[in-house]
């Protein structure tokens, strides 16, 4: 949790906001009751950080949470559990777009690891790390992301994994 007034300090100090989106849809079950509704306005405040120019870095926090990055992508897009609750999402003003979410999982994570000059985006001269999936993430509804299958993983330009048919 962060107070809205403290977000500018992240920008001024060049800090990274590193979070796991899946935590938001787990913590929403108890956060209001335990922490108070006014305090949780700044829980997983991705939009506040992004709008202030703070670097976001996302991960899965496996094995504590589900290892699939698509679960985290779904959480960042919807702020809802797998059943679609609550309607509209928990603190929906903090939801992100798919572009923003994927960037936080890739370029943002590389930046947080001080490795953004080597990986995190597809660009000549950087490592070619690619995940090929079974659907166009930009053309499916968020709940469909939960069933995404990895077909191939390429690390530094070489095939590291291929799904069996």
How should each PLM-predicted stretch be described?
Residues 4-138, 143, 148, 152-156:
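His/Asp/Glu-enriched, well-ordered alpha-helical/loop segment
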């Amino acid at each position: 949790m962060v107070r809205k007034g403290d977000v500018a300090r992240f920008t001024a100090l060049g800090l990274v906001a590193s979070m796991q989106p899946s935590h938001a849809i787990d913590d929403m079950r108890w956060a209001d009751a335990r922490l108070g509704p006014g305090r949780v306005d700044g829980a997983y405040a991705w939009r506040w950080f992004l709008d202030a120019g703070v670097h976001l870095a996302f991960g899965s926090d496996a094995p504590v949470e589900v290892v699939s990055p698509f679960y985290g992508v779904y959480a960042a897009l919807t702020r809802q559990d797998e059943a679609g609750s609550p309607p509209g999402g928990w603190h929906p003003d903090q939801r992100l777009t798919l572009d923003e979410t994927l960037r936080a999982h890739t370029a943002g994570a590389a930046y947080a690891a001080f490795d953004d000059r080597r990986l995190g985006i597809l660009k000549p001269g950087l490592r070619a790390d690619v995940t090929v999936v079974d659907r166009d993430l930009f053309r499916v509804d968020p709940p469909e992301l939960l069933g995404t299958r990895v077909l191939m993983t390429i690390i530094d330009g070489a095939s590291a994994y291929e799904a069996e048919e």
